[in-house]
Amino acid sequence: MSDKLKQFKLLIVLSLFLLAIPLYFTYNHFQQSSVLKEAFEKNERIEVLHHLMASGKYASDIRKAGYVVPPDGAIRLDGGIDSIEIKGDIDLKISNPGRNEVTVLFETTAKEEKIDVYYILDNQLTIKRSYYSNISNQKIKESVDISQAEEERLLKIVQKELEDFMEKMYQTLYG
């Protein structure tokens, strides 16, 4: 009788252990999803981008929303999404965000010159740092200055594109 009781106890312990594993993963998945939704609702843009780009988990959702991300193999190799491309009034490339900032790259034209623009934005999508450059006739990358009015115009376009991205991703994920 004692042997059967030990086997029964062992079977119960093993069953509880096997039940705990999927419950843990289900809880963990729900927790991550709720953290992302909370970041969306609090308008924490950097945190939202970080969660979306931290792994390949949301790559198909980002593609479904109409944005461009690297192929799944590259995402697995990099351990996450290194950039998201937004096609709009200007074609933006968002790099994986840092702690309190996100890098946005795009091209524009000013004075009939193609200019590469590099913005580092904070959570309110204001410019922390900016850099403008072009390739000269001698194939040398040179720094370019643009007017304050032009910078403000470009920033408004970038802010609109990023806000539209956030709204569309929220609708795609929780819609």
Regions found by a protein language model. Give the residues of each.
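Short, Lys/Arg-rich N-terminal segment immediately upstream of the first membrane anchor
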Residues: 1-7
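Short, flexible coil/linker elements and helix-boundary hinge sites characteristic
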Residues: 8, 34, 43, 56-57, ...
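Hydrophobic membrane-insertion alpha-helices, especially the h-region
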Residues: 9-28
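Intrinsic structural disorder/low-complexity segments
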Residues: 10, 32-35, 121
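N-terminal export/targeting and maturation segments
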Residues: 22-105
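Extracytoplasmic electrostatic interaction patches
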Residues: 74, 78-175
